[in-house]
Amino acid sequence: MISSNDFRTGTTIELDGQVWRVVEFLHVKPGKGSAFVRTKLKSVQSGNVVEKTFRAGESVQQAILEKSNLQHTYVESGDYVFMDMSSFEETRLTSEQIGRGAKYLKEGMEVNVIFHNGKVLEVELPISITLKVTETDPGVKGDTASGGTKPAILETGAQVMVPLFISVGEMIKVDTRNDSYLGREN
């Protein structure tokens, strides 16, 4: 159990059968009446964000999460197979469990998988990864009327917008949180 007075950004709690992460919190002490804690909670499973108010000192069940560092080994019949590098146990995850990060997975990549009561809650990819451009239109010199970017398909099948000077075969860094181009990789 955790007191609502101890809430911090990133604290995970169990509420109504779901696991929630505290995104924002504010301790309020009105001049009249008792103190309370106003929070913004994000569901780890669905991503929904709700606002909830707790009485000051109210006890809430803290969610106990396990974080494992797993390496993506291969894909078999639609399932992504990961291996725990310390115990060599295999874990199979579907693309729904991995979420939007599945398009960036390549063999040998290490990810953090967060478990709650033995069930996968989320898969954390590295913030930036380096991938090879496999398909893109050639950049025409002086063609900047469209904003200076063009679509490119990467080695994993992901599509990102890149500057006009990027060509097929180049290695680029991509931000996995918002699918944005970060720069060339030497």
Swiss-Prot record:
Q: Has UniProt tagged this entry with the keyword Protein biosynthesis?
A: yes
Statement: the UniProt record of this protein carries the keyword Cytoplasm: yes
Q: Which InterPro entries match?
A: Elong-fact-P_C (IPR015365), NA-bd_OB-fold (IPR012340), Rib_uL2_dom2 (IPR014722), Transl_elong_fac_P/YeiP (IPR020599), Transl_elong_KOW-like (IPR013185), Transl_elong_P/YeiP_cen (IPR001059), Transl_elong_P/YeiP_CS (IPR013852), Transl_elongation_fac_P (IPR011768)
Q: What SUPFAM superfamilies does the annotation carry?
A: Nucleic acid-binding proteins (SSF50249), Translation proteins SH3-like domain (SSF50104)
List the pathway annotation: Protein biosynthesis; polypeptide chain elongation
Q: What is its main location?
A: cytoplasm
One of the record's GO cellular component terms: cytoplasm
Q: What does this protein do?
A: Involved in peptide bond synthesis. Stimulates efficient translation and peptide-bond synthesis on native or reconstituted 70S ribosomes in vitro. Probably functions indirectly by altering the affinity of the ribosome for aminoacyl-tRNA, thus increasing their reactivity as acceptors for peptidyl transferase.
The UniProt entry, under NCBIfam families, shows: efp (TIGR00038), PRK00529.1 (NF001810)
This chain's protein is named: Elongation factor P
Q: What is the organism of origin for this protein? A: Prochlorococcus marinus (strain MIT 9215)
What gene, per UniProt, encodes this protein?
Answer: efp
